[in-house]
C-alpha cells in the first residue's frame, strides 16, 4: 500500500465519499435486525405479568402472587421461580451457542445470509410460542428465538460498521440499538393492548406477533447488498469495487479499495482466527470484546427492561398500570437513543460512556434508597401511587442514561475495533459474552431480588462505578477512524501500545507510529501525516 496516512480530527484517513441514499436504505433495513432482539426483551416481561399466562404455565407463581397481595407478605419474592426465569433466560443461552456458528456463516456466506437465517429461525420460534400448549413447547420456541437473535446480533453490527463511511459509522451503527429500543417499545404497547383481550388468550397474540419483526429482517435481507469488505474477503474483487463506488457515491475509491484489499490479504494469512485472536497483538481488542458486553449487562438494564412490568407490579402498580409504566420507560429508551445518534460522531464514544455512567450511578442510588426506605428488608409495605411514580421517574432517568451510552456503544465499539482477519471471531465473542451474562443475570435476578432486596440496585451501581473507571483509563477514542486503521489507535494508547509491535502495523508504507503515552489513545495528526 503506497502513500502516507492523512489523518482527520478523529485520527484516521478521510476517504472520499458521501452518505448515499443507497447506503442509508441498506443500513436501515439491516438495522431492523435489532427489532427481533428488542421485541423479545419487551414481550417476555409483559406476558409473565399476565395472570392467564401464569395460570396456564406457572400456576405456582400465580398462587404465590395472590397470597402476597392478600396477606401483605414479602413483595420481593413473589415472582421467584426457577422455571419462570428459565423461560425468560433460555433464549440467551441459545443465542450464545448460535453466535459461534453464526461467525462461520457470516464469514463464508456473507453478512446478509446470516441475517436472513436469523430472521427465519426467529419466525419459526414465534409461531411455536404463539401456539404453545405446555412449558416444554414454550421453552423450545424460546430456544429457536435465541438462535435467531444470535445470528442477527452477530451479523448486523458488522454489516453496519462496514457499510458506513468512517465519519458516520457511529450514527449508522447505532441504528441497530435504535431498532432494539423500538422493538422494546412496540412489545410494551402490544402487551398493554393484548392484556385487555377477554378470554385470557392475549399472551398468545403477544408471543406470536414476534413473527412480524422476524419477517421484516428475513425479507429485507434478501434485498441487501453485500459489503465491499465481505465481497473482497470472499474473492469477488470486481463486484467489491463496483459496490464500493455505489456505497460511497464517487469514482474516487482507489485508496479505500486498496486498503480493503490489503486488509483482506492480511486476513487470509490467518488460517485459524479463533487461535490467532489470542495472540498478544490482539489483546486490546479481545479485552474490549469481553469487557464491554460484560459491563453492558452489569448495568442491570435488561433486568429493568424485560422485568419492568414485574418490577412495577412489585412496587404496587396494578396490572394495567405496570404495563403502562413499562411503555413509558420504552418511550424514554427510544428518544434517548436519538441523543446518541446525533452526538456519537461529534462528541465521541468516551464522553458518552462517561456521562451515561455517571447518570446511571446516581439513579441506581436514588432508586435503591427509595425502595429500601419503603419496603426495607421485610418487603412488606403499601406504596402510595405518587411515591411509586417518583421511583418510575428515576428509573426513566436511568434508562435514558443507558440509552445514550452503554446501550448503543456496547454494540458499536466492539464491532468497529477488530481487523478483518479476526473480525467475525471477535464479534462472535462479543455476542457470546453479551448473551452469556444476559442469561446469568436474567436467571439470577428474581432470586437475587428475593434475597438482596433493595441492595440489588446498589450492587449494579457498584459495577457502574467500575465500568466507568475502566472506560476512563483503558478505552481509546475511536470516532472517525476507518476500521482498517484502528490498529494505530491501539498502538498510540498509553497502556495498550505495549502489546503491539511496529511490525504488527500494516496501514501504509510511510506511516510513522506515534509514541505511546496518550491516555485517550487518540492518534496525533502531526505525527501521522506526511
Swiss-Prot record:
GO MF annotations, alphabetized: monosaccharide transmembrane transporter activity; symporter activity
Disulfide bonds: none
Tissue expression pattern: Expressed in leaf blades, leaf sheaths, anthers, ovaries and embryos. Expressed at low levels in roots and shoots.
Topology feature Cytoplasmic, residues: 1-18, 103-119, 164-169, 226-291, 345-359, 410-428, 475-530
Location of this chain's protein in the cell: Cell membrane
GO cellular component terms, A-Z: plasma membrane
Membrane topology of the entry: Multi-pass membrane protein
UniProt topological domain (Extracellular) ranges: 40-81, 141-142, 191-204, 313-323, 381-388, 450-453
Induction notes from the record: Induced by glucose, sucrose and salt stress.
Pfam families for the chain: Sugar_tr
Keywords: Cell membrane, Membrane, Sugar transport, Symport, Transmembrane, Transmembrane helix, Transport
Transmembrane feature ranges: 19-39, 82-102, 120-140, 143-163, 170-190, 205-225, 292-312, 324-344, 360-380, 389-409, 429-449, 454-474
Role summary: Mediates active uptake of hexoses by sugar:proton symport. Can transport glucose, fructose, mannose, galactose, xylose and ribose.
NCBIfam families noted in UniProt: SP
Entry similarity comment: Belongs to the major facilitator superfamily. Sugar transporter (TC 2.A.1.1) family.
Record protein name field: Sugar transport protein MST6
Protein's gene: MST6
Amino acid at each position: 500500500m503506497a502513500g502516507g496516512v492523512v489523518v482527520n480530527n478523529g485520527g484516521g484517513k478521510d476517504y472520499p465519499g458521501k452518505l448515499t441514499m443507497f447506503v442509508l436504505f441498506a443500513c436501515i433495513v439491516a438495522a431492523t435486525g435489532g427489532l427481533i432482539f428488542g421485541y423479545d426483551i419487551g414481550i417476555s416481561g409483559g406476558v409473565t405479568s399476565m395472570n392467564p399466562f401464569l395460570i396456564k404455565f406457572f400456576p405456582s407463581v400465580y398462587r404465590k402472587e395472590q397470597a402476597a397481595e392478600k396477606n401483605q407478605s414479602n413483595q420481593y419474592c413473589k415472582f421467584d421461580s426457577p422455571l419462570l426465569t428459565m423461560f425468560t433466560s433460555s433464549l440467551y443461552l441459545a443465542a450464545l451457542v448460535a453466535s459461534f456458528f453464526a461467525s462461520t456463516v457470516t464469514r463464508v456466506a456473507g453478512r446478509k445470509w446470516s441475517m436472513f437465517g436469523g430472521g427465519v429461525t426467529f419466525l419459526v420460534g414465534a409461531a411455536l410460542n404463539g401456539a404453545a400448549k405446555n412449558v416444554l413447547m414454550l421453552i423450545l420456541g424460546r430456544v429457536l428465538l435465541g438462535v435467531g437473535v444470535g445470528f442477527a446480533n452477530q451479523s448486523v453490527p458488522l454489516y453496519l460498521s462496514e457499510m458506513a463511511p468512517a465519519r458516520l459509522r457511529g450514527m449508522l451503527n447505532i441504528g441497530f440499538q435504535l431498532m432494539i429500543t423500538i422493538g422494546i417499545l412496540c412489545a410494551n404497547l402490544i402487551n398493554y393492548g393484548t392484556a385487555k383481550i377477554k378470554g385470557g388468550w392475549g399472551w398468545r397474540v403477544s408471543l406470536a406477533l414476534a413473527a412480524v419483526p422476524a419477517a421484516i429482517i428475513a425479507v429485507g435481507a434478501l434485498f441487501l447488498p453485500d459489503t465491499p469488505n465481505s465481497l473482497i474477503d470472499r474473492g469477488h474483487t470486481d463486484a467489491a469495487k463496483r459496490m464500493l463506488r455505489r456505497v460511497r457515491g464517487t469514482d474516487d475509491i482507489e485508496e479505500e479499495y486498496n486498503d480493503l484489499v490489503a486488509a483482506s490479504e492480511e486476513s487470509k494469512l490467518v488460517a485459524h482466527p479463533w487461535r490467532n485472536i489470542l495472540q498478544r497483538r490482539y489483546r486490546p481488542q479481545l479485552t474490549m470484546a469481553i469487557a464491554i458486553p460484560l459491563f453492558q449487562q452489569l448495568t442491570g438494564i435488561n433486568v429493568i427492561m424485560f422485568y419492568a412490568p414485574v418490577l412495577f407490579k412489585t412496587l404496587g402498580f396494578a396490572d394495567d398500570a405496570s404495563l403502562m409504566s413499562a411503555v413509558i420507560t420504552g418511550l424514554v429508551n427510544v428518544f434517548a437513543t436519538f441523543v446518541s445518534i446525533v452526538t456519537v460522531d461529534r462528541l465521541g464514544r468516551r464522553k458518552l460512556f462517561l456521562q451515561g455512567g455517571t447518570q446511571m450511578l446516581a439513579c441506581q442510588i436514588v432508586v435503591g434508597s427509595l425502595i429500601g426506605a419503603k419496603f426495607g428488608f421485610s418487603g412488606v409495605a403499601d406504596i402510595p401511587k405518587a411515591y411509586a411514580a417518583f421511583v418510575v421517574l428515576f428509573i426513566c432517568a436511568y434508562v435514558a442514561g443507558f440509552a445514550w451510552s452503554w446501550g448503543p456503544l456496547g454494540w458499536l465499539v466492539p464491532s468497529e475495533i477488530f481487523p478483518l482477519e479476526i473480525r467475525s471471531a471477535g464479534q462472535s465473542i462479543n455476542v457470546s459474552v453479551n448473551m452469556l451474562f444476559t442469561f446469568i443475570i436474567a436467571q439470577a435476578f428474581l432470586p437475587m431480588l428475593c434475597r438482596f432486596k433493595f441492595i440489588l440496585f446498589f450492587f449494579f451501581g457498584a459495577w457502574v462505578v467500575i465500568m466507568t473507571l475502566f472506560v476512563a483509563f483503558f478505552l481509546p477514542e475511536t470516532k472517525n477512524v476507518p476500521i482498517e486503521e484502528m490498529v494505530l489507535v491501539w498502538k498510540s494508547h498509553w497502556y495498550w501500545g505495549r502489546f503491539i509491535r511496529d511490525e504488527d502495523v500494516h496501514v501504509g508504507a510511510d506511516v510513522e507510529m506515534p509514541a505511546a503515552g496518550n491516555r485517550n489513545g487518540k492518534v496525533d495528526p502531526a505525527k501521522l501525516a506526511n
